[in-house]
Structure formats: structure tokens, C-alpha cells
Amino acid sequence: MLQLLVRVSSCNKLVTLSSSKQLRKDQFERHLFMTAQQSIPSISVTYAHNASASKSNELGMRVMQERAYQKRGEQYLLIKSPPASGKSRALMFIALDKLRNQGMKQAIICVPEKSIGSSFHDEPLSKHGFSEDWIVKPQWNLCNAPGTDGGKVDAIKKFLDGGDEILICTHASFRFAVDKFGVDAFDGRMIAIDEFHHVSANPDNKLGAHLAEFITRDKCHVVAMTGSYFRGDAEAVLHPEDEAKFDKVVYTYYEQLSGYEYLKQLDMGYYFYTDSYTDKVLKVLDANEKTIIHIPNVNARESTKDKIKEVEHIIDALGSWNDTDEETGFLLVTGPDGKILRIADLVDDDPTKRERVSRALKDASQKFNRDHVDIIIALGMAKEGFDWIWCEHALTIGYRSSLTEIVQIIGRATRDAPGKTKTRFTNLIAEPDASEEKVTHAVNDTLKAIAASLLMEQVLAPRFDFRPKNSGAMVDYDYGDGGYDPNKCNVGVNRDTGSIQMEIKGLAMPQSDAAKRICKEDLNELLTTFVQDKQTMERGMFDSETVPEELTQVRMGKIVQERFPNLNGEDQEAVRQHAIAALNIIQQAKKKATGGDSGEPTLNLSLIEGVRKFAMDVQELDIDLIDRINPFEEAYSILAKSMSEERLKQVAEVIAARKVSLSLEDARALVKRAIEFQAQKGRAPSLSSADPWEKRMAEGVVYLQRMVREGKNV
């Protein structure tokens, strides 16, 4: 169940969100504006709670691991699965099969940092039904070895020349080894890349360049794993032609969290504040919740530039320091209620103290001890690969440029643990201030935080299966009261998988296998590029003259063409329609689930019911209607209700100052749509049309005609 809740703490009244068009009529009036002193909008997702994720088959494999193992014979395999879903163990099963049954000489596991190497320690797999155990000889887990990454290159060469089978090293050590010995030295080996989002198709990304060489040589097997197939810089992870060679195993957040035994609710909130964050932390922090606090990087806007004092302020706000635990290094702080809080400080500049605390947090004997630690304060640590199952709140201070980093931080809080039914992620962000020299950067940070929120909604939602109207009922799908009706656009739900089948009139369907795979597996990557495009979001949220189709058809169409140039025009259009449908239907379902149209909160509605209500409330759900929805209208509503009126005006002014006129590229795209319009309607788009989209297409035609008259190369 996906719900957007807005509360006013002073009267605890629920407030609904109106559409952006209503907001723009009277741009900054008639709204409730909230600051960090009040509760703010949050995404609240409730899951099925069926414990399937913790159940194992006869080989000791959980659902995701079994799914991955079924594709163990693929030469190139990409596993996309959330944090804590068991990717490391899935790789163990696959690697052992490649060594025993697929002719691979050795398995090399590459992780981004040394601490993650512990995920691949020895595992007694045979104890749970598998044919053998996972055993790594100590000298070949280079993550445990002293020295620099570059200094471990000779050890990798010794491993390659020897007879042992499994090696663990960092991405950096692996890069240095490939630089020195060449890709041919790794022929006949399985290379596994954990946290694959560190790779990029950019030529400057060494790991990405090496991977492309391995694929070109085609003499090794590659298994890539990631909890978030996103990059904060919006770079492509792989070139399309290389990506097409990978078979994918996709296990969604929805499947993961629905399958938990205990945890059933995840809340996400974005809080804006003024002045210093250290004065606002307790507004969003509950000392009774097991919490990881990530303070801002010293170069971030939110930083006071003194990380040590920031930690001291947080500790002072929590209570009074009593002592330091000699064994663990945890700070013992007495809260206002007399409770002793055990606080782990991973920010301390003293490496001896920090290492003692870090070692205590990794103590395997304390993994299931809920009382071992209460609050962890970190800066760059406690993210990727950090395992603390009891974490109930991930509090991140400052904007994070990478969606991947946000997913990784959220993953720290989404472990299943006895008695843990709810968890939350909070991002505390400084409001843009016009007095700042870098106000433009501050505005960009704010918009990117909202983009991350939109993307996380997509990540957390169930999977959609879009089909044209009258496609027929599917087995195991519930179509609501009365069942499947061939006279309408139906919405069916598979309660076991959480998949939603939705019929849309006029929907173009992918024809090639590549396009079908993209529509099934890769829509979130397209949406990432779309919502992280600064100009697209600015126009969608703040330019009242922007017609939704300029975003949904022109901008998304361009992204699809750039991302998948090898698809034909029909398949590109099908992919575009599926991507926009996924984004807009989630936004509209969220609005329906919270009573956003009627003004009456209906918080008992789940996302699924919101989807059904949206489909029922329109006379007929067709792709043209979906294209006419501004994908950012709900995002604007969130911003208008969570930021002060003065700050919101400043944001609008900054964005208005950099508004750009129609580009030649956009004009070409509009002319293409105008040709389609003329084929359908039997006439050209008119400049005097009351339909803003028709008028915009006509403007594109006029612009291009003018360029031709002026002798420009169009």
C-alpha cells in the first residue's frame, strides 16, 4: 500500500494535495506552508508481509537466489536486487556451479571497498542442502590484507598462476591488475562485479572500459550485481550494445519487502529547514528508534564545516555524556528519560578510536543483540554493505547527489528483524536562501531531492504489466468485483507477485525481444534519466506555459531514442508510452489513494485501489490521456506544502531567470509529432487551436519553417 500523508502537527489535521494547475492559478496563495518544526509530506508504503523472502528451497536458496541460480548458465548475467536480498549468497551458488560444471578455472569477486569483502566469507552452504560449501582461503581475500589496492596486484598475478579457485579483491585492485596484465590474463575466469552501479560507459571510467574489453574479447564469464542500477551522475552504466548481451535477474523492492516476516511498513520523508541543522535534528529524530545518522560532507551546503562539533551538538541534543565503553568505544549518553543511549561515533578523526568502534559494529556475535548499539553517527561510512538489522531510521542530513547513495542508505534500514514492523528514511535538507552566493546550486539540490523521491516511489511500487484494451483476462489476476469486463479498461492484480496488469486504450506494444525486455525490466532506468534532467523538471514544475506532451512525448521520446538507438521507431514509441504510463499512473494512483481530487482524505486506500479508482474515474483510460498528465504536478504540490512561501518564490525566480526558448532539436521533435497528428486528423496542427498541445506542435512547424527560410541547416 503506497500512501502520501501530509500532517499539520499543531492540529493533527490531514491535508490533501491539489494538482499543480490549481496551484499555479494563484501561484503561492491559499496553501499551507510547513517547516521542519511541523510534520511534512512522506511516502508510506505498507507491504503484504507474507514471509516468502525468508523461506528457502531444498538447496538452501531464498526466492531471489533461486531465480538467479536458474540463469547460472548465462555468460553475462546482471542481478538487480535490493540491499539485504541475498545477492552475495546468490553469487556463491552461481560461482560454484561455474567452477564445477561450466569450465571456469577461477572465480574473482570484485567489491567497491574492503569492508564489503566480509560479505563473501566462508559459508556452510551444504548445511542447508547445497552440494558444497563456499570456502575462500585467507590469503586470497585481499580485502583483509594490509597495504594499498595497487600493492595487491602481484598477489592477483600469483592467484591467476596458481591452482586455487576463489579470490576476493576491491574494484581498484582489479583495475590495477587488468592495467598491468591485460584482459587476456583473465581468460576462462568468472569475474563478478559487486555494486555494479560503480561502472559507467563513460570512457574515463576505468572499470567500465575494462568491462567493455572483456565483453569484446568474449573469453570470460561476467556476473554483475547491484541493489540500484542507477548512477547519480545520470551516466549510462553500459553501452546499449553491451547491455543487450546481459541476461537479467530482477527482484524488486516490492517483492523483497512483501516477503519479509516482520517488517511491513517503510516511510520516507523529506524535511526542509532554515538555519543550522543541528538545531532541527530532534524534530525528526526519535531516540527510542535504532538510528543511523549520516551528517553532511564538509563541502555540502548543509555542513557547518566542523564535523566534530556537529557530532557534539547532536550528542548534546540527545542527552548528557556519561562515559565511554572501553571494549566497544561506544559513547554512553543519558537521555532526558534517564535511559542510557549507546552511541557509535564513526566521524571521530582518531583512527584508533574509529577502528575500535567500527570493529565493535562488525562483531558477528552481536548481530542479533538489539541492545548492542542505539544510534550510529557517520559521514562516509555505514552505507554500502553495512549490515545492522535493527536499524529503524536512516536519517540523512544534506542533499545526496546520487540516487544510488540514497537507495544504499535506505537499504540500511530495510533489514528484517524480530519485532521490527516499521522503518523510515528521512532526508533533512536546507531550504534555498536567496542571500546565499550559490543559490542556484541550492535550488538544483532541492529539485534533485524531489527527483529522488519520485524515483523511489517507482522503485518501491509493484511491477506494472501494461496491455491494450480488451487483451483478455490473465490467470491468477484479480479484476475486482464482477471480474474481467471486455467492455472497459481492466485493472488486475496478482496477489502473489504484487504485479498489476493494466489495460490502456491505444497503447503501443513492443514487438522485438529487446523492446519487450526493456518494457519489462528497464523502465526505471529511463525514468531516472527523465526526472534527473534539470530542464525537464524545471519546466514541469514551474513553467505554466509548458504543455505536458512536451515532456511526455517530446522529452521522453528523445531519451528513448538516445538510450536505445537500435530499436525501430515503432518500438521506441512503445517503450516511451510504457515509461510515461508507469510514472504518471503511480502519481495519479497516489493522488487517488490520499483523496487528492475530492479534498477528502481516504487513507485506507492502497496503491492498488488508487490505480483502480484512477482507471474508473476517467471515461476511458487511453494513452493520449496519460500523455496529457504533467508528471511533476504532484512533486510541485509536495514542494509547495513543505517549503516556506518566501523560499518557494525564490526558487521560482531562479528558475524563471534561466528559461530557454524553443530549440532546433525540440522543434524537430514537434514537427515529427505534427506529421503524426496530420495523419490521424487529416489536417495540420493550428496555431489558433484551443488545445495547447496542438498549438505547440504548430509552433514547432512554424519555427522550423523560419529556420529553412533563413537558410539554416535543419
Q: Regions from the language model: what does each represent?
A:
Residues E74-I94:
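Walker A/P-loop
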Residues I94-S119:
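Conserved SF1/SF2 helicase motif Ia
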Residues L238-D279:
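Interdomain hinge/linker at the junction between the two RecA-like core domains of SF2 helicases
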Residues R415-T546:
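Long, hydrophobic alpha-helical segments
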Residues P82-A84, H197-V199, F214-V237:
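Conserved helicase ATPase motor motifs in RecA-like P-loop NTPase domains
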Residues P351-L454:
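Conserved RecA-like P-loop NTPase helicase motor core
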Residues P82-P83, V111-P112, G117-A155, I166, ...:
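Conserved C-terminal RecA-like helicase domain
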Residues V183-R217:
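SF2 helicase catalytic motif II
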